[in-house]
Amino acid sequence: MADAVMSDAHLLGFNTRGTKRESDQQLHLGSSGASGAGVKRQRVEPEQQEPGNPMSMPVSQAYQGFAPLNSQGNQEPTATPDTMVQPFAAIPFPPPPQNGLSTDYGSQHTQDYATQSTEHGIPLYGGGQSLAEHSAPATSTANASSTTDGSQTEGQQSQSQNNENSETKASPKRLHVSNIPFRFRDPDLRQMFGQFGKILDVEIIFNERGSKGFGFVTFETSADADRAREKLHSTVVEGRKIEVNNATARVMTNKKSVTPYGNGWKLSPVVGAVYGPELYAVPGFPYPTAAAAATTAAAFRGAHLRGRGRTVYGAVRAVPPTAIPTYPGVLYQDGFYGTELYGGYAAYRYAQPATAATAATAAAAAAAAYSDGYGRVYTADPYHTLAPATSYGVGAVASLYRGGYSRFAPY
């Protein structure tokens, strides 16, 4: 009987190792010390005789999925391939954190291992094609993410450029308008430029004689300022072609202090000669000699010196100097102090008329003695109330405007 079972097993393709394993298993369950071959024959024969025994079905047959040979009284359902033990499936791990970004923007987690389907047989791992299939989506995902990042960067750059352009257009802009009619005032300039946009400020530059013929107009936006400049530049207004340009910031440069005097003095020659004659001695200046100075000082000793700074004037200053035209040219750098202004006055001071009265002559001598030689007389001078000489003319007035300081100047 056992030989028949073994022959049937060989015909059906059974592996005899399962039978041996099953007999070994049966051996451990409590059989006495019998040989392996005898136990195998002893256990196969009772299995066919006892169909109701739950241990009658061989383990190898149930594991391989085949029905037992003698299943006459077996009440258990036949095992199918669907009820086989499934191999280990990869657990889907959660995706890594994306630094606060939602999962929509993060790269999707791809399954690292392929699950074995029941249709395939023994192989638990996929071939090279499956690996390529899984690596291709990862590569495409990386390319897609890099493309998305590049597009986002380009979008941010374009948006920042648009913001800069809008800020530039929205910033105020100042225009310089020149050659405007002299009768124009701020309302006239505002009316002329107001048609192009909102104006923040209008300013026409004036001096003590009136309008200087140019001004500034500040628009709220640079776009309006550019449009006004294009429309109004080189247009003729009341016979004058006005010019409209972009106003530039005034550059404040630190100019080197160049002394206006040729001899390198730090102070004006007039101031230096008055308050410190011994410090500012000019070559060629007609100072008296020491003996003449001593004689003059002795003659004027005890006399009451009137005027400012009596302690400043020494024996040298007590002697009346010669006429101003004989002074060296280095002393006067401008017409304001030159003979253009004081030449006539000095001429009539030192050229007294011969027919003058004795009192007038004495007064003139006293005036010459007590004056400082620069037109300032500190005593009663009968000629002091006379009008200036004819040499005080247009040239002197022009030099006053050019060289002097005017409080009406806008700069």
From Swiss-Prot:
GO terms, molecular function: mRNA binding
Keyword annotations: Cytoplasm, mRNA processing, mRNA splicing, Nucleus, RNA-binding
GO cellular component: cytoplasm; nucleus
Region (Disordered): 16-175
Residue ranges, compositional bias (Polar residues): 58-83, 99-119
Function per UniProt: RNA-binding protein that regulates alternative splicing events by binding to 5'-UGCAUGU-3' elements. Regulates alternative splicing of tissue-specific exons.
Protein name: RNA binding protein fox-1 homolog 2
Organism for this UniProt entry: Xenopus laevis
